[in-house]
């Protein structure tokens, strides 16, 4: 893969200490790939039986419908994918919806939703009851989001194309559950998307942190009292994770961190 940015490596070395070498070694290990069966289209047991005819599947332990598959399976090329039988999604990305754990009948917001992996997973948990609002600020990515929602056969989802501030005007204290999978500097994507290496800089980390805090502020106004807001990123930077959450909590003492 493309050489990792030196400033990024220096930051990671300082942050990880003795675990730094293991972190570097992880870039040479095979990528873990997964898919999530869509029980909105067919009974899970039947879907699993069908998919095992074509793919080598091993269960992802933290989600009901998630499976690892082997690289040479190429499930994205199979007609079952186009039919919406499953969604190709990294196993780690399946964790957020599992932690948010919406219940059938609840109102749920995925604020930064494209391309739709987490949204379609949240919708499956609603079991056709309640409503899911899947929002994406970028028009081109919003079209992809809409296509995936349609492909997965989700009937109780509304796709919106707004910034978080605009959306918050329409849904004050409305949602039981909100997912903010925030735009970030993408440090966790370097191995998957090598172009992200060239786009990274310490300045981008700072900029992303400011934007994430703004998104969280707007999300807070859309959450019902007693609701649950889950914040996630695909980056390692403390400025975009721990520090963002810390600043948010300082401004919102009515919120507290839930242990998972």
Where are these regions (language model features)?
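S-adenosylmethionine
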Residues: 1-260
């Amino acid at each position: 893969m493309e050489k990792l940015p030196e400033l990024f490596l220096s930051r990671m070395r300082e942050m990880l200490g003795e675990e730094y070498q293991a972190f570097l070694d992880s870039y040479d290990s095979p990528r873990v790939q997964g898919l999530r069966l869509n029980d909105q289209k067919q009974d899970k047991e039947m879907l699993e039986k069908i998919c095992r005819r074509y793919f080598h599947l091993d269960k992802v332990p933290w989600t009901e419908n998630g499976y690892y598959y082997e690289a040479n399976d190429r499930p994205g090329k199979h007609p079952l994918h186009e039919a919406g039988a499953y969604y190709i999604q990294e196993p780690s990305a399946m964790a957020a919806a599992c932690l948010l754990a919406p219940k059938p009948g609840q109102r749920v917001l995925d604020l930064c939703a494209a391309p739709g992996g987490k949204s379609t997973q949240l919708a499956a948990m609603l079991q056709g009851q309640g409503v899911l609002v899947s929002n994406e600020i970028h028009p081109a990515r919003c079209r992809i989001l809409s296509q995936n929602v349609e492909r997965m056969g989700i009937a109780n989802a509304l796709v919106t194309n707004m910034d978080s501030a605009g959306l918050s005007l329409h849904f004050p204290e409305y949602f039981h559950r909100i997912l903010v999978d925030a735009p970030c500097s993408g440090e966790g994507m370097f191995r998957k998307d090598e172009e992200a290496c060239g786009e990274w800089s310490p300045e981008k980390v700072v900029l992303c942190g400011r934007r994430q805090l703004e998104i969280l502020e707007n999300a807070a106004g859309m959450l019902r009292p007693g609701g649950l807001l889950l914040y996630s990123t695909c980056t390692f930077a403390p400025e975009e994770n721990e520090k963002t959450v810390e600043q948010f909590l300082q401004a919102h003492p009515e919120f507290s961190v839930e242990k998972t």
